[in-house]
Each structure stands twice: as C-alpha cells, then as structure tokens.
C-alpha cells in the first residue's frame, strides 16, 4: 500500500483545487521542484504529478516544472494531464517519468491506450475521474455516459499498470475518500486501483489498511498533506507495518 503525495501544477506553481475548479486554486508552493524534494525527504516512495493546465489544453503546458521535478527527486514520478498521443508518452518516458497517466484519451481512444501498454509495458496508468458516478473528461469539464466500472473493464488484459480513481465530488474538500465506490471498482476488475479525491485525515490512512481495501495499490493525498492533517511519518509507518 503506497501513499502518493500529489503535486498539481497550475501556471508553474504547486496548487490544490476544490472540486476540480481552476478558479478555486490555492497556491501551496511556488517552487514545485522544492516541494518534490521535500516529499522525498519526508520518506515518500512515489510522486503523483498533474499538469492541470495541460488537462484543459490537451497538451503539456507545465513541462518545464515537470522537468525540474524530475531533476530534483530520485523518486519515481507518475504524470497526468494533457498527454494524448504515443509521441507525447514516449517523450515523457524518455525524460525520466516512471509512469504516464492517460485520462481523456482512455475514453476517446481506448485503442491508443492498449497500444501504449504494449509498447511501454508497466509504464501506463489510466486515470478514471467520476462525478456522480459518471466518467468526466477534458479536465473534468465534460461528463460522459460511462460509469467508472464500464471504462475500467475495457482495459482488462491490456497491461494497464494501475487505475487512478478520483471521485471529483470529494476532491480537495477533505471529506474522506469514497471508499464504497473505490472498493467496488477494485472488486470489479483485476487491475490495481489507486484511490484519489478527498483523503482527509489519519482515519483514511487507517481505512487503507483494513482487509477489504487489500486490493488497492495505494492512495493519493494532496490538501491533507499540505494542511498538516496527515503526519507523513506516522502515515508511512502505518502503511509499512501493514505491508510487512
């Protein structure tokens, strides 16, 4: 079970949004590379990065900030937001990314996701972001008719390394992860699930290590870490103990 600290990039800065609204951005660090280094020094094993501008633009916008992060940390980094082609995937992996997250393109062009999984085994994750149970795309600006489980099942056997499941209605508001929906998704597919959206306190960390959450690969935390609601040392110790 891995706790992924999140760096969301908007205009080159480390921010957190509320319910996915770009107008509701709180700046936590104007130096994302320094934040990445701080997370590494706190003992985190991975880093979750999202190019928020890129998610809306359909192409990488905060590339310079991502490259600075890659230079600042030795931890593996997964990146999502605006990555929509094999060429973009390959370019980012060549720059040192450990994993690329495909969101909108997983809905629009699932064949590309399967091709990417074949070409870059173990390097492709699918981001499934749901609002009211339906998958949202284009930086959460549009909602499709697909449910999270329907989309996830399309990629069974494709070689997807993980599915990052975000409940948009919980994102950035510190109300706790939607464990019922997340565990239901984990039970519906064999692909490892990473929970995202709403992780609020140490109670969520304690929830992560319960037996019914055993299928989860981990969870992503943003605002709760930045606001000090989760103690990194205590959280990581709890997760390490659960893995032992």
From Swiss-Prot:
Compartment(s) of residence: Cytoplasm
Organism name: Chelativorans sp. (strain BNC1)
Catalytic function, reaction form: 1-(5-phospho-beta-D-ribosyl)-5-[(5-phospho-beta-D-ribosylamino)methylideneamino]imidazole-4-carboxamide = 5-[(5-phospho-1-deoxy-D-ribulos-1-ylimino)methylamino]-1-(5-phospho-beta-D-ribosyl)imidazole-4-carboxamide
Keywords: Amino-acid biosynthesis, Cytoplasm, Histidine biosynthesis, Isomerase
UniProt-listed Pfam families: His_biosynth
Protein name according to UniProt: 1-(5-phosphoribosyl)-5-[(5-phosphoribosylamino)methylideneamino] imidazole-4-carboxamide isomerase
Keyword hit for Disulfide bond: no
GO cellular component: cytoplasm
Keyword Electron transport among record annotations: no
EC number: 5.3.1.16
Pathway(s): Amino-acid biosynthesis; L-histidine biosynthesis; L-histidine from 5-phospho-alpha-D-ribose 1-diphosphate: step 4/9
GO biological process terms held by the UniProt record: L-histidine biosynthetic process; L-tryptophan biosynthetic process
Family designation: Belongs to the HisA/HisF family.
